[in-house]
Amino acid sequence: MARLLPPTGTSVFRRFTPESLVEIERLIQEKSTREELEGAEEEPQAPSSDLEAGKCLPMIYGDPPGDLLNTPLEDIDPFYKTQKTFIVISKGNTIFRFSSEPAMFCISPFSIVRRGAIKILIHSLFSMFIMITILSNCVFMTMSNPPAWSKTVEYVFTGIYTFEATVKVLSRGFCIGPFTFLRDPWNWLDFMVISMAYVTEFVDLGNVSALRTFRVLRALKTITVIPGLKTIVGALIQSVKKMIDVMILTIFALAVFALIGLQLFMGNLRQKCIRWPILNSTIFDVYNSNMVNDTTLNVTDTFDFKAYINNEENQYFLEGSLDALLCGNSSDAGRCPEGYTCMKAGRNPNYGYTSYDNFGWAFLALFRLMTQDFWENLFQLTLRAAGKTYMIFFVVVIFLGSFYLINLILAVVAMAYDEQNEATLAEARDKEEEFQRLLEQLKNQETGSKASLASQKTQSRGSNRTGSLHDLADEDVIKDCNGRIVPRLIVNRVSSNKELSAEEDQKSLSSKHSMQYLDQPKLSKRTASALSVLTATMEGLEDAQRPCPPGWYKFADMFLKWDCCAPWILFKKWVHFVVMDPFVDLGITICIVLNTLFMAMEHYPMSPHFEHVLSVGNLVFTGIFTAEMVFKLIAMDPYYYFQVGWNIFDSIIVTLSLVELGLANVQGLSVLRSFRLLRVFKLAKSWPTLNMLIKIIGNSVGALGNLTLVLAIIVFIFAVVGMQLFGKSYKDCVCKISEDCELPRWHMNDFFHSFLIVFRILCGEWIETMWDCMEVAGASMCLIVFMMVMVIGNLVVLNLFLALLLSSFSGDNLSGGDDDGEMNNLQIAIGRITRGIDWVKALVASMVQRILGKKPDNTKEEGEGDIELYALNHLDEGKMADGLTNCLSPTLTVPIARCESDVEEDEDSESSDEEDAKATLNDGDSSVCSTVDYQPPEPEPEPEEVEEEEPEPEEPEACFTEGCIRRCACLSVDITEGWGKKWWNLRRTCFTIVEHDYFETFIIFMILLSSGALAFEDINIERRRVIKTILEYADKVFTYIFIVEMLLKWVAYGFKTYFTNAWCWLDFLIVDVSLVSLTANLMGYSELGAIKSLRTLRALRPLRALSRFEGMRVVVNALVGAIPSIFNVLLVCLIFWLIFSIMGVNLFAGKFYHCINTTTEERIPMDVVNNKSDCMALMYTNEVRWVNVKVNYDNVGLGYLSLLQIATFKGWMDIMYAAVDSREVDEQPSYEINLYMYLYFVIFIIFGSFFTLNLFIGVIIDNFNQQKSKFGGKDIFMTEEQKKYYNAMKKLGAKKRPKPIPRPSNIIQGLVFDFISKQFFDIFIMVLICLNMVTMMIETDDQSAEKEYVLYQINLVFIVVFTSECVLKLFALRQYFFTIGWNVFDFVVVILSIAGLMLSDIIEKYFVSPTLFRVIRLARIGRVLRLIRGAKGIRTLLFALMMSLPALFNIGLLLFLIMFIFSIFGMSNFAYVKKQAGIDDIFNFETFGGSIICLFEITTSAGWDGLLLPILNSGPPDCDPDFENPGTDVRGNCGNPGMGIMFFCSYIIMSFLVVVNMYIAIILENFNNAQEESGDPLCEDDFDMFDETWEKFDVDATQFIEYDRLFDFVDALQEPLRIAKPNRLKLISMDIPIVNGDKIHSQDILLAVTREVLGDTIEMDAMKESIEAKFIMNNPTSASFEPIITTLRRKEEERAAIAVQRIYRRHLLKRAIRYACFMRRSKRKVRNPNDNEPPETEGLIARKMNTLYGSNPELAMALELETRPMRPNSQPPKPSQVTQTRASVTFPRPQGQLILPVELTSEVILRSAPITHSLNSSENATTIKESIV
């Protein structure tokens, strides 16, 4: 920032007068004249970013004088000095910039009207008035039924907006010139709003409600009024711009997947179970006879087949389902019940909107799948209709589409935010530097003692400013009312002595850290006089620290500092001593934990006694916390007490607790009890991770201020738009979506419900509400609105939220904790306790030794221990004086302490002892932190790595540890002779066996076989006796093999090595389970419950594969490293959720019960059944039940389950409906009676779900980055082999540039080669591919035969065209065709297309397999993928995916392993549960395939609520324990609720929260890497482009072009290598080598243009080596070329020649003049002494040389000039006249080239160039010279 420092003070502000305008016009004229003279424009300046319109005036300018405020002033930005602008500065020092042109062509800037308008416009009250108007207007817009007088109010609003626009137009002008009304895009919004208001008022445009929606844009006006919002909207727009590539790729991928879906599943979702055969036998006979005779039914027949199958009464419906049951005709599809057959009939599911019948609906289905909204429904419908095999399609779409592309959007938004953040920080740093330079300048101006004081003040303030940049946002800093940091010295002082001594005064002045001295009265007066110059410039810095009004100090001294008398001060000291003791802190923490436990023990139903105990407990805890607050107030004084954040927090909670006790019996205020829960947050004081989480949320919410406002505006706008557009439709067409014609829960008829729908869309749930909307209001408008909310709100703004959250994580904050070297009081107390226990142990040990008569030899240590204990206790007493602040504000008080110790060196040495003791304590007890916060160990090699790095031992190690051998001498064996030698030989043999590769391979094979065997033990095993017997024997064999393996390893490795390896332990435990199970079977105890449950643990067998497969092992190692951090966050999340769970119990316990009709499962209305007793009375006469919602808030455990369902948005609707309908305990719920309970769920979703679940992504990414840096930046998810693949992929990315394909010598081939090499040909083929894609999109399920025929013919044409293209390329490119990857791809696609065309006929005729037919048709979609070839951005993203593949494969393996294990568990435990909710004949745990399908669904957290519900059935009447399962002895269809909840929760945490987030972490990292590579100035595409352009200039592939064509070639390149014409000078200066024949080599040109882009950097050197190496590799046989000259050298030679010519021509001119003079004197007979000889000799010599050595035009001209007769009386022309005279002379060279025209000037300068240029008198000499050069 090399800008000159602007002048300080107010002298820069000058009124804008007519003279100022004249001066601007003069400067503009001067600038244009200068440009004309110099012939080139000046470097464009940029306006100062500090002086932009809308920003505050920088403090360096000071405050403008009052009379210059709100007055037009001359522009202070140098950039605008030559532009017609002026500025006005408002009272808040905000800059406004206006055009000085007359507004509307008539109102000059000096007009009273315009000045008045400007004053109104910039006044803060005007902005406030407009803001209030907009907010009021927004309130009126939310009214669904506005009152009659609202029309008048509407006119008022329109009038106000018109007035605002008029003021703006009068003050700024309308649209001509800068800074006018329409030049600001935000004003377009105003213009549109006002125009629409008048248009709708005066022109009848029909649909009024639709036009009223335009009014909602007024809400966007808030963005124009609030300054910070414009910035954040700018950032959003930037992120959207950056998302274009990802968006294109996403849409392209969606289109491809939609086409695949269209081909595979077209029409499948209409296959329903139809009642068949028809009961009426006659109709059936008619139908049957017609079918047999192969004729269709006659229209006159009575039986209407179409009407029959479309009649819903003939279709099979499941209980409670809105759509008929789907089915399929393939073997693994859904089956129909008896009496029904599968036919295509009726409409598609979900009002007909879920289908693949045409491209549009298929695209919507795939978008829904990609955004994972209710995709389990689509998954279940498709698999039921098409078959389970098609799960593969969903796996690909979920992993590629949902996990990869959706997270790419997150990556792009995060990147855009980071860039924005970087730019902001850079700007702040620049300002800081400029400010510091200014301070230096100001300091230099000051002299004497005043100057020194001033500089001290400046430094102090400057340091404050620097600190503010790196503020840690800690709430724990102790500040006084001025906002200044209060030193400990003052906080802890309780004596009445308030004056500093002179010595202390001096010390405090000498310390730069103490900031108190400037506030002392005498000093501040002197300083003020010294700083009078700086007052204006420094004022901005004091904003944050403005002192309180003087009255407050008196008030504080009198009432807030309790220092009344000596006894009170003594009492206060004692209270301080007790309250600040670490043990009191420990006690309070224990009370907080106990209080939390007491609150968590509330449940329904509770016995009165238990309720009483909890009530008393609450009173006790409230008393304890109140007492703590009171004592702290006494100890610290209110003045200092309320300067600690935690104390304020405590006081608020205590006050609320006391208020709640007082209002305990008031109805409706029970919610106050919830505030007690906030005490849990007090744990954050002593729990760093919780503290850190709260800080992250705090920082994010702080940073999100503006973004939250933008999101609120978006939500508001869309809620109002929805209400205005669709509200009436919901009311009028409600019967379409509701059986009882009542409004459903989700509608847009009023603002609140409309807001809830928009919020639900932001949560990612949009499809179900959109179906309702489309049904009542039409598809098109609903699609547009819902998609806009989804894309803008969810994908952009919410991802920006997440990006902010991720950016809140810094390096080690989750694992390192608060490593500030100080411990909190809790740690000190625990340290004391442990030391006390150690001391007691030592005491007991010494007493025992004395009793036994041994003399203790540790007297010295004991003495030292006493000293240490004394020192530590003494230290603790010292710390008590520090109080609570010691652990709250360590980072800010350390420097102060250091300064004090510097000046107080002569104090008692006791303090230094304390310091030493303190240091010892901190070092020794750092482990206390590690129990809470995992700290990664120093980078030591892990066991596996050690094995890899060090040579493995050739012989077995010792069996036992040295300790064992010392204690048991018999374990020591001599291995040199006897039994010992035999034992040693046996061990060596075993060692050789287990180390052999064959043994390891065999064991892996056995593990895979035994795991595979488990998959067969499904529900059908009892019916397959043979398989069951085989599996039983196999199980025994596997067990024996694994036991033998374990014994071999014991003998080979020894117990020491075996049992110190974690993987061996895993093997040992799994073998033990098999062993116990086998033993129990042999003894006949296999039916025991314990043994049965133990048998399920066999599912862990596949875990043994972990250590054998390196790919999985590296992922598990990385995961194990992350477990402490993940566990930490999980614990913090559980604490966070505990608050919401307890609150839920307080609000909803026992209130979810309701009375239902057991036959219809519907709730009985409240007017029939009011409460539980009414229901019980009905129970004896009717089929009714008083039931609870299965997932509820009756206790904290169930509350947690409810919150997990809400956080994953699965099953949350039922919970929310129950909450909103709830009344009181034992009362029948009523529809939406408790409407605002929705807010509980909204708040939890924001804080509990959004923040905490996304925290997992943050912690995983953060932890893996740490591990990566620990291992030196290596990828921790890849094996060594995979790293080789990764590097190979990287090399492929930077592949060598192919050698240009030589043009064939054959004429016809050459013509074809030229044709296919043209860009037009590529564009033509791309257009055809797009058209082909369009024709595929046109296909529909119910298309006519004609349409099908036409599409078939079109497809035929495309196949012919693409085949022709392939043949042409093969013909022209010869063998080189297959050297290009894309050509091979095209070739394969063409072959497949032809094969598909031929096979489709054969399949249709001979094999009726529609599935196979469809799969073959997919080959056509391959053509679409060719489009990728043309898109650089998309290739980058796909390359990032290719780079991610090895790591993703490893994670996929781990995920499959987890799914495998859990599916075996599921088969063991949940195979026989009742089929209801999410469990049916396809989705269940009966077989391994079904289990895998269910678990794949849950991997994305989808549908787990439906699978859990049947498992929660624990007994009658929900399920039947005696239910007989056919084909097996197992009875009952009840679930196991405890096991089910554990199973699903653990799987969701492991897969959805951990493994899937690892997947996301890898994608983000690889995307960043790919972006960094593509963000390089040059990439491989640029070099490819260079080659393509080169081929056009060097058709014969000689690798050379002529020097004259160089300039055209470089101009023909694309950015960034292109150098546009005129480029002659630039290229000449590049010093490019030229070889014989005036030719230049391609490599030299490439190096030159590359250097131009990269500059002389290290990258350039590397690039040069790479290019040269590749060239040598590509052209091993090419002849070497030696440059004879370079472009720059040639130019220098030309210049030298011209210089010589110029000198010589001057000499000739002088000669000619002398000759003329000689001739004249001769005629006049006047002789000169020197005129002995005529001066023509040189001319004669030159003429002779010209004759001998060829024609030289310059010389010829000179000679001609020399011999041309001159008039005797002619005067030599003036230089200016000669300059304006031009002549164009062209002379032929001997080689036949044209030479340059000669330009005649006063110096007779003759220049040459390779082109002929005709000069005319109007052209500027300088311009022509430059163009020639």
Curated annotation (Swiss-Prot):
Gene Ontology terms for molecular function: voltage-gated sodium channel activity
Question: Which residues are tagged as glycosylated in the record?
Answer: 207, 280, 293, 329, 1157, 1171
Residue spans that sit within the membrane without traversing it, per the record: 359-383, 751-771, 1197-1218, 1488-1510
- What SUPFAM superfamilies does the entry give? Voltage-gated potassium channels
Q: Can you say where in the cell this protein is located?
A: Cell membrane
Keywords per UniProt: Cell membrane, Disulfide bond, Glycoprotein, Ion channel, Ion transport, Membrane, Repeat, Sodium, Sodium channel, Sodium transport, Transmembrane, Transmembrane helix, Transport, Voltage-gated channel
- Where would you find the membrane-spanning parts of this chain? 125-143, 151-171, 186-203, 210-226, 246-265, 391-411, 583-601, 613-632, 647-666, 669-686, 703-721, 783-801, 999-1016, 1030-1048, 1063-1081, 1090-1108, 1126-1145, 1236-1257, 1321-1338, 1350-1368, 1381-1398, 1412-1428, 1448-1465, 1541-1563
Which cysteines pair up through disulfides? They are 273-327, 336-342, 735-741, 773-782, 1155-1175, 1519-1534
Show me the IV repeat boundaries.
1301-1599
**According to the UniProt entry, which residue ranges have a biased composition of type Acidic residues?**
902-916, 939-957
What stretches of residues are II repeats?
A: 564-836
Domain named IQ is located at 1693-1722
Membrane topology field:
Multi-pass membrane protein
User: Which parts of the sequence are annotated with region: Disordered?
Assistant: 32-52, 446-468, 901-957, 1765-1786
Q: How does it assemble?
A: Voltage-gated sodium (Nav) channels consist of an ion-conducting alpha subunit which is functional on its own associated with regulatory beta subunits.
**What role is this protein assigned?**
Pore-forming subunit of a voltage-gated sodium (Nav) channel that directly mediates the depolarizing phase of action potentials in excitable membranes. Navs, also called VGSCs (voltage-gated sodium channels) or VDSCs (voltage-dependent sodium channels), operate by switching between closed and open conformations depending on the voltage difference across the membrane. In the open conformation they allow Na(+) ions to selectively pass through the pore, along their electrochemical gradient.
**What family is reported?**
Belongs to the sodium channel (TC 1.A.1.10) family. Nav1.4/SCN4A subfamily.
Q: What's the protein name?
A: Sodium channel protein type 4 subunit alpha A
Name the species this protein comes from.
Answer: Danio rerio (Zebrafish)
Quote the gene name from the UniProt entry.
scn4aa
